[in-house]
C-alpha cells in the first residue's frame, strides 16, 4: 500500500465528501436511540427504576434518594460519592467551584439533619442540644472521610 494514495468511500460516480445514507428512513435510528434512552431497569435493592445504561456506567446516581436503612459505612460512602459527583459537575471555573461547595454544604446539612432525626426522633430538644448533636455528627463524618 502506498502512503500517498487517495481513497474514496461510497459508490463509483458519487460526489466526493458526501456520505451516502445507507438507511433511507431514520425511523430505525430514532427507535434505537429511544430504546437506549427510555429503557429502564427496576432495581429491587433501591426499589426504583433506573436507566440501565447509566447504572452500568456509573455506580453513583445523583437522583437516588437517601435510604435511612443504610449502615454508617454505606451512608458515608454514599455521601462521599455525592461530594465527588458535585465536584465533577463543576468543571473548574471558580464560579462553578463555589456553587459546588455550596451544594455540598447543603447536602452535608441534609445528611446531618437525617442522622439527627434518626438519633433523636420526635423528642423535643433545645437549640443548644441540637447544635451539639450536629457537631458530633459532623466530626464523625469528617473523621471517617479522612481515615486511611
Feature names for model-found ranges:
Residues 1-148:
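Long, non-globular targeting/processing and low-complexity regions
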Amino acid at each position: 500500500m502506498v502512503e500517498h494514495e487517495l481513497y474514496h468511500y461510497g459508490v463509483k460516480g458519487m460526489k466526493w465528501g458526501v456520505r451516502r445514507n445507507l438507511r433511507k428512513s431514520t425511523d430505525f435510528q430514532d427507535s434505537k436511540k429511544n430504546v437506549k434512552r427510555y429503557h429502564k431497569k427496576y432495581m429491587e435493592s433501591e426499589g426504583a427504576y433506573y436507566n440501565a445504561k447509566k447504572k452500568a456506567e456509573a455506580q453513583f446516581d445523583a437522583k437516588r434518594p437517601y435510604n435511612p436503612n443504610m449502615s454508617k459505612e454505606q451512608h458515608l460512602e454514599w455521601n462521599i460519592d455525592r461530594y465527588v459527583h458535585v465536584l465533577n459537575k463543576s468543571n473548574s471555573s471558580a464560579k462553578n467551584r463555589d456553587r459546588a461547595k455550596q451544594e455540598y454544604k447543603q447536602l452535608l446539612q441534609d445528611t446531618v439533619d437525617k442522622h439527627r432525626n434518626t438519633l433523636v426522633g420526635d423528642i423535643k430538644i433545645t437549640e443548644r442540644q441540637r447544635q451539639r448533636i450536629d457537631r458530633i455528627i459532623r466530626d464523625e463524618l469528617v473523621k471517617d472521610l479522612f481515615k486511611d
